[in-house]
Amino acid sequence: MTTLRQSTPLGKTIVIGISMHSKGYTNLKVGHAATFNLADKTFWEKIEKIAKTTGHPIMPDYKQKADYFFCSDKFQLGKFTKLAGEEVATVRIKECPIQIETLVQRISTREDFAIVECEIVAIFVEEGILHDPTHINVDKWQPLIYKFREYTTANQSLSLNFRFQEFKES
């Protein structure tokens, strides 16, 4: 599990931005697959529970100064349920209403981040948010949105991330 700088779906492709210093980036280079678990608005507390963790045992100074800690199993810490991938080797998070399995097609590196193009190979959607077999009911889908260190949903602020105070003090 890792956070993304940006994600954009384009047809059957998802383009993401990711720090090259993250364990997630290392996993993408080695495994060539990714699962995007799209959380709903009820999920922010679980995300915040793992927010100060890193999957990489060697931490950059800025993470050490911010009291991050190494966690080899974020699923256990966040109390997430693993589901085996059906088309890829990566796992899905059962509690996330939408899960998208992808294969990495291209990685373009910059100074400290990478742009990764992923081909969508499977999509799983919780039945309760479907309008019909191929469309999501937008009135029932309340995605968790992480916007400038704040957890929100389509029209409501839910909570602030622990790092939000950094911006208020600047």
List the model feature ranges, each with a label.
Residues 1-170:
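Basic, polyanion-binding surface patches
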